[in-house]
């Protein structure tokens, strides 16, 4: 892309994968003066007991996979002259569907789980569904609302 040709760059559920100075410099280069960088993540609402139990089951499996909740992605914004945080908005939302749809299949799509052998994924699916049943009494085919907190960051390009 040509330099200073873009009004805004938006990254949803992804910036933690490429949170480095090289990426920030390239985004800064293509943004017009006073351009905007938006970063958005949906995070499981671990204030809810059954969601927290699922998160605790997932945590040991993460390894060194880049994750939003580790906060490591934020380090690239420390002491850099390219972007200024203008705002952070947080809001609650839910995804509703069957336990299998919005819990099991969603968790199985997580990068480090999707890379596992199918047999291990199926075992985890069963464990996820057991956790939900233990806390909520809901079977895989029952409807449930999975709570999330959305974090929306707005950065503005600092003029050169």
Question: Language-model segments: what does each one mean?
Answer:
Residues 8-12, 20:
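A short beta-strand submotif of the Rossmann-like class I SAM-dependent methyltransferase core
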Residues 1-9:
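A short acidic, Gly/Pro-enriched loop at the edge of an enzyme's catalytic core
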Residues 28, 32-97:
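Conserved catalytic/acceptor-binding region of the Class I
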Residues 17-27:
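A short, conserved alpha-helix within the catalytic core of class I
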Residues 71-160:
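Conserved Class I S-adenosyl-L-methionine
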Residues 3, 26, 36, 41-42, ...:
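Catalytic core of nucleotide-sugar-dependent glycosyltransferases
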Residues 2, 20-21, 48-50:
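Short glycine-/acidic-enriched loop or helix-start segments at secondary-structure transitions
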